[in-house]
Amino acid sequence: MALITYRPFVRADLPRIRDLDRTERIDVLYIQHGTQLEERRGNFDSPNWLAEGTGEHSYAAYQAHLDELLASGAFALGAFDGDRLAGVGVLVQHLRRGIAQLAWLHVSNGYRASGIGKRLSDDLDRIATEGGDSEIVVSATPSQNTVRFYMARGYRPMAEPFPELFELEPEDIHLHKML
């Protein structure tokens, strides 16, 4: 791994999404009951995104989703290992009055636990604060690694998730923190 550089991730970078490897071994998933999290043991392998087609779990679908976020004014920050995308985070400011959304945060397998996710999250928190938001929400994949990452960053389960986010991701863990 070379020196990681951080810079705005712009629409011209969208094809780099194919650099990301989302594979992950998942032994524990969480189910959210208000502010309580129920741990469920499991035996799951999260596969990579599909290289072909436009289905829900394809690179094309994720690229289109990120394109929509960027077109709507979201700010994205990329972590690059040379020309290779190692991670990306997307911030939607003012989702609600004073509340930002961490709409997407992904660090490629092989780069996890290296500080990239922390740096992306911290930088996006700072940008949200500078933009006038005092709280941030995230809909997190319910895997133990992901939930622990956010909890270590100060996020806590929301008693009542935002309906518009819950509708999109009902199985996710809906978290928030004050900035």
Model-derived regions, located:
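Conserved catalytic-core motifs of GNAT/GCN5-like acyltransferases
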Residues: S58, V137-T141, R156-I173
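Alpha-helical elements of Rossmann-like donor-binding domains used by nucleotide-donor carbohydrate transfer enzymes
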Residues: R16-D19, R119, D123, H174
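Conserved acetyl-CoA-binding loop-helix of GNAT-fold acetyltransferases
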Residues: V107, A113-A128, M151-A152
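Acetyl-CoA-dependent GNAT
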Residues: R11, D19-I99, A103, S108, ...
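Active-site-proximal loop/turn and secondary-structure-junction residues that shape catalytic pockets
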Residues: H106, P142-Q144
